[in-house]
Amino acid sequence: MGVFNVEDEITSVVAPAILYKALVTDADTLTPKVIDAIKSIEIVEGNGGAGTIKKLTFVEDGETKHVLHKVELVDVANLAYNYSIVGGVGFPDTVEKISFEAKLSAGPNGGSIAKLSVKYYTKGDAAAPTEEQLKSDKAKGDGLFKALERYCLAHPDYN
């Protein structure tokens, strides 16, 4: 098994606590509202905390697919959230899981800095994700982040 790590950082004009609420606490209901391709996020097992399994259903290339998220950490006090994608329809068979560790902190002018660590765990001697795949995955993640940021900005009473 290989482990391939990618670090990323993105800033927002939205305050950390409000952004965390949109990205984590309310994500299951907000995300399908702000991203057309995402049809639903539902809890399959658990209560939303560590160990919870969520099913995210989406449409890609005209085909309905889903991935399973396993929640590993929900730390509201420290604005941290960790989860792994552990399977699903359309999930690469060469990958065991993709783990995400996210943390929000105070940024300039009352905004936020989001730090993200992504680890790809490949099966056997499978190759690392291609540069094209990494760029595609980053674009999807950035798109989700910015869509939820736009929601917060468009709804100033959201807190």
Swiss-Prot record:
<keyword id="KW-0568">Pathogenesis-related protein</keyword>
<dbReference type="GO" id="GO:0005737">
    <property type="term" value="C:cytoplasm"/>
</dbReference>
<dbReference type="InterPro" id="IPR023393">
    <property type="entry name" value="START-like_dom_sf"/>
</dbReference>
<dbReference type="Pfam" id="PF00407">
    <property type="entry name" value="Bet_v_1"/>
</dbReference>
<dbReference type="GO" id="GO:0009738">
    <property type="term" value="P:abscisic acid-activated signaling pathway"/>
</dbReference>
<dbReference type="GO" id="GO:0006952">
    <property type="term" value="P:defense response"/>
</dbReference>
<dbReference type="GO" id="GO:0010427">
    <property type="term" value="F:abscisic acid binding"/>
</dbReference>
<dbReference type="InterPro" id="IPR050279">
    <property type="entry name" value="Plant_def-hormone_signal"/>
</dbReference>
<comment type="similarity">
    <text>Belongs to the BetVI family.</text>
</comment>
<dbReference type="InterPro" id="IPR000916">
    <property type="entry name" value="Bet_v_I/MLP"/>
</dbReference>
<protein>
    <recommendedName>
        <fullName>Disease resistance response protein Pi176</fullName>
    </recommendedName>
</protein>
<dbReference type="GO" id="GO:0038023">
    <property type="term" value="F:signaling receptor activity"/>
</dbReference>
<keyword id="KW-0611">Plant defense</keyword>
<dbReference type="GO" id="GO:0004864">
    <property type="term" value="F:protein phosphatase inhibitor activity"/>
</dbReference>
<dbReference type="GO" id="GO:0005634">
    <property type="term" value="C:nucleus"/>
</dbReference>
<dbReference type="InterPro" id="IPR024949">
    <property type="entry name" value="Bet_v_I_allergen"/>
</dbReference>
